[in-house]
C-alpha cells in the first residue's frame, strides 16, 4: 500500500457533523482504507479528542457509541509511545500548535503519511509534512 493518511480529530468531527465538502472527502479516504487502497492512521490522543468533543456536545453514551463506530473502521490507532510523545513535544516546542495536534503531526512526520485536517494550525507545518487541507462551507 503506497498511500498513507493520518486523520486528525478535525477530519473525523467534520464527518460526524456532516460538514461538507470535508465530510465527503473523509468518506472517500475511509473507503480507500476499507478497500485496502490506503493505510489509515490516527493517534490515540486525537481519538480521545473526538471522544471528549462528542461527549461535550451530546453525552458520554453518544461518545462511547461514536468511539466504538470509529474502532470498527479500517483505521489503525497508534498509541502514545515515549518516541511519539517526544516527537510531539518537540513539534510543540517549535510550532504554535495544540498538544493534541502535535501528536497528529508527529505521526505524519514519523510515517511519511499525509495529514488530513482542516485545522489552520497545520498550515505552518506544510514545509515539514504533507497536509491535505479540508474545507467546510460556512453556515
Predicted features along the sequence, with ranges:
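A generic structural signal for short hydrophobic patches within well-formed alpha-helices
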Residues: 12, 47, 122-123
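Short, well-structured N-terminal submotif of metal-dependent ribonuclease cores
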Residues: 1-42, 55-68, 138-139
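Acidic active-site catalytic centers that drive phospho-/nucleotidyl reactions
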Residues: 8, 101, 119
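Active-site neighborhoods of divalent-metal-dependent phosphate/nucleic-acid chemistry enzymes
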Residues: 76-116
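Helix-loop "lid/cap" segments that line or gate small-molecule binding pockets
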Residues: 53-54, 74
